[in-house]
Structure formats: C-alpha cells, structure tokens
Amino acid sequence: MEEVHILTLYPTLEAAEEAAKEVYKKLPQIKNRAEIFGQQAYMDKDDNITGYEERLLISSAGMSMNYLFDVVKSAGGIYIPAHVDRHSYSVLTNLGFIPDDIDIKNIEISRMTEDVDSFLAARDELIKYNIYRNSDAHYLQDMREAEAYLDISDVSELFGG
C-alpha cells in the first residue's frame, strides 16, 4: 500500500470533526505507547491538557485517495496533496502522477524545494494547480515565519462562500 500525505482544510471546526470521525474509523486498532511515540494530548483553547488519545495516531489510515477526497468534499473541505516535491509520502513519488479522476485543484510544495519555479517548469502537468507552501512542521520549534498568506477578509472566501 502506498502512503501519501494529504492536507485538508475545513470551513468550521464542526466540518473538520465530521471528516476526522471518518478517518478515525480507518485507523488500525493499535494502542499508543507513550514511552515510544509520546503523549497524544487533547488541548483546550487555553493550551490546557483535557485528556489523552489512547489509539496510536501515527499509523496510516486504510483509505484510498478517492475515498478521502469524498470525505473531505462532503464536509465542505479543501483537499491538498502534501509535499509533492518530496521523496517520501508524496503522491508524485508513489504514483508518478496526480490522479485525474479526483477533482484536485491545489497541491502543496514543501519548504525543502528552494526553487519552486524550476520544480514546476520541469513538471508541466503541475502548472494547472494552485500552489501552497508550508513548513510541514510536526513540532512547534520547526514552524517558520509565513512566507505567503491568503488575502481574504473571511475564511468563507477560501471555501467558495
């Protein structure tokens, strides 16, 4: 089974929770070993720990890209194949192409690619996508200052509202 990372954005917390329930159902039934993988804490808006997730969340969800796309779309979200420029967990590395049977409008290129224009010039098929750039940070200390931003007055503009 190929593994790819997909970034998803949602118009509301409720929409994100709706999609998360579907993804959670597809995770393997493996208990987290905090001494190996660390704690998986639930936090409130004030960064207080409110509980811990017992199931290991680092595992791959057993679902196809198409299935996830349908989940995201039904929740009103945006589906973005992540770090398509990287050698791991990239749809381009795993499949060699971006499937055309999924209505993908956006892709994400990681901070690892310094010359995005050259990367895109070598791959004509990517020109048609909206490009997002992110730090792909998994830890707070890896987050970087924003190099780009979305010029919108309300989040609903991002979701066609």
Language model feature labels by segment:
Residues F37-G51:
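Short, basic/glycine-rich phosphate-binding loops at helix/coil junctions
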Residues S64-F69:
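His/acidic metal-ligating clusters that form di-metal
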Residues K31-A34:
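Compact, glycine/acidic-enriched structural inserts
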Residues D47-A61:
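Surface-exposed cleft-lining segments at the edges of enzyme active sites
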Residues M1-L27, Q39, L56-L57, D70, ...:
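Charged catalytic cores and adjacent phosphate/nucleic-acid-binding surfaces used
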